[in-house]
Amino acid sequence: LAEDKLAEENFRRAIELDRSDSEARNNFGWFLCTRGRYDEGLEQFSAALRNPLYARPEDAMANAGQCAERKGDLALAEANLRKSLKLQPDNPNTLLKLAGLRFRQGQLMETQQLLGRHAELAPPTAESLWLGLRLERKLGDRVQEAAYGLQLRKRFPDSNEARLLLSGQYE
């Protein structure tokens, strides 16, 4: 807690020194969001995006999307992730986050398309393999489900996703 307090003080000091420092606001927003202070985090992302000179607005949009999803505002999460992808359509991390969100929303075909794009752009991650496995399970393709499971256990045996697989916790 003492480290969090010091980190927050440093973020606030950086923003006081340069109110237009969008990178500091983006980082502070993520800091707040990961501590459950979603509304404050979303406000920092909004402040970062109000700067017309911000070189990487897609980062703040993607982070705002993830923060909104953590908050439970799936519509806002989707809107921000899609805005981020408009600016950087080949960002594998944002594609994967949107795929996960669309899976949660029951949009299985779009999830499949987004995962396919992700696979074209980046090597598999524990997160992408786990999502693929759960998607194929919902679609009823046991062969693909097993293939994802094998890759997950082989490539990422110590991951949280592999532990979930081994314990049968698919949801």
Model feature map: region roles:
Residues 24, 31, 58-60, 94, ...:
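TPR alpha-solenoid repeat register
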Residues 17, 51-53, 87, 120-122, ...:
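Structural marker of alpha-solenoid helical repeat scaffolds
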Residues 118-171:
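Terminal, low-structured helical/coil segments at or just beyond the last alpha-helical repeat
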